[in-house]
Amino acid sequence: MIPVVDAHQQESIEAVKNLILNEVNVKELKFVGLEKFWREEGGSLAYGSQRLLEIARALASDPKLIILDEPAGGMNDQETEDLMRVIDAIRNRGITVLLIEHDMRLVMQICEKLVVLEHGTLIAEGTPAEVQKDPAVIEAYLGSDDDEEY
């Protein structure tokens, strides 16, 4: 039998849900360094802060895995540094991070293991140090001595 809830009880339930959601949201905003903006609309934030807000939203669902697709795209150096600290802190919470990124400085500094694709085909896998020395990666992304100069 399902209990019947009157309008007043439903309001109380909704109020408690909202308090819990606000507590979770503020916790995640603090985690990414945006707690001072908790009353602001997301669209009014600077670009790098908007990206961190997106990460905070994802973290509010208590994920086991978070996929970050080009999170540093369009960020300046300071915003990228802030992002690297957040990614490292996410990993320290025991959350797996799948990072899809073209900012090689970020990738080489933050990742433990790399998988490199060229046109959807796996060409290398390993630590950043191993991948940097891989001939297939050098050929695909840095060019070879045999390539013509444009």
Where are the regions a protein language model picked out?
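Glycine-rich phosphate-binding loops of nucleotide-dependent enzymes
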Residues: M1-Y150
